[in-house]
Amino acid sequence: MTTRVGINGFGRIGRNFFRAALEQGADIEVVAVNDLTDNKTLAHLLKYDSITGRFQGEVSYDDEGIIVDGKHIKVLAPRNPADLPWGDLGVEVVVESTGFFTDGEKAKAHLEGGAKKVVISAPAKNVDGTFVMGVNEADYDNATMNIVSNASCTTNCLAPLAKVLEENFGIERGIMTTIHSYTGDQRVLDAPHSDLRRARAAALNMIPTKTGAAQAVALVLPALEGKFDGLAVRVPTPTGSLTDLTFIAKNEVSVEAVKAAVKAAAEGELKGVLKYTEDPIVSTDIVGDPHTSIFDATETKVIGNLVKVLSWYDNEWGYSNALVRLTALIGSKLA
């Protein structure tokens, strides 16, 4: 049965989620969008995208919403999620992608509005579970979990790879760096920001900053609790990021063994999530790739039991595809 979905926040992730759901042919119907932006602008930004290109379909708008390939999608504009008529619209699952309701205590307002489930498209606190597809989605329990998080784009890249490495070689401890494209949280030109590094011009600087992705891996892989730390370096690209993980394995390993383990997982249990490549790729080559983790095999380095691996990810498109898969999974469990 098709899951009826509402999107709260039709920004970068909200629009990419919408596109990805159509491209995947997911058993999802987006029936409503809540956003404070006017319908004309929402339709325009869906139709034309500087990264993903022009929408391959017909997009228009009217006073009540946007129209995509002849299907009308209602646009709402309440600021408080509790005021949204999700129940009246038959919305079953809400994708919370505003970035403002990353606390389950606030996101539960969607349930008060009549939705059955909420999926937060960001790391979140006070939720019933955090999930990374390919890693721990089997732990989802429809009976007890109403508000869940899809983690972050970086955690979605790191966790599948860490799962393979932990299961095959054991991880004593590790440090990761995400070389991450700039995001809307940064400043286009130097301007005030609570993070003084993010206050600097995003397209002109490499910007060291924080990430919670390393610690968040333990939310989906409890065996790695307390074993990871990390940081981010924001770089002047609009999308396409790279996770650099250095870890100490429990025993000595070889480059060949690491590559073989990841390749086997990418062709087996993690197919569609983890991708293996030996091509000499650069960041633009993975833009538009739906995998959440693209292992760059030829950059694997080993000294004894000290290992360095690299994995690429399209921090918008790859993440949005994972968000679609998690939403579809949750919808499939509804009675």
Predicted segments, located by residue:
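Predominant activation on well-ordered alpha-helical scaffold segments within soluble catalytic domains
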Residues: F18, K108, A159-E166, T177, ...
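Short, solvent-exposed beta-strand edge segments and adjacent coil->beta transition regions
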Residues: T144-M145, A201-A203, G240-D244, L306-K308
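Acidic, glycine-rich segments within the central catalytic cores of soluble metabolic enzymes
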Residues: E167-P238
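C-terminal active-site/capping subdomain that shapes the small-molecule cofactor and substrate pocket
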Residues: G230, L242, T246-A335
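Structural beta-strand/beta-sheet cores of well-ordered domains, especially the beta-sheet scaffolds
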Residues: T3, A26, E172, L204, ...
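Short clusters of hydrophobic/aromatic residues that line enzyme substrate/ligand-binding pockets
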Residues: I66, F131-M133, I147, L189, ...
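Hydrophobic alpha-helical scaffolding
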Residues: A151-S152, M206-P208, I248, Y313
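N-terminal Rossmann-like NAD(P) cofactor-binding subdomain of oxidoreductases
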Residues: M1-A199, K301, R325, S332-L334
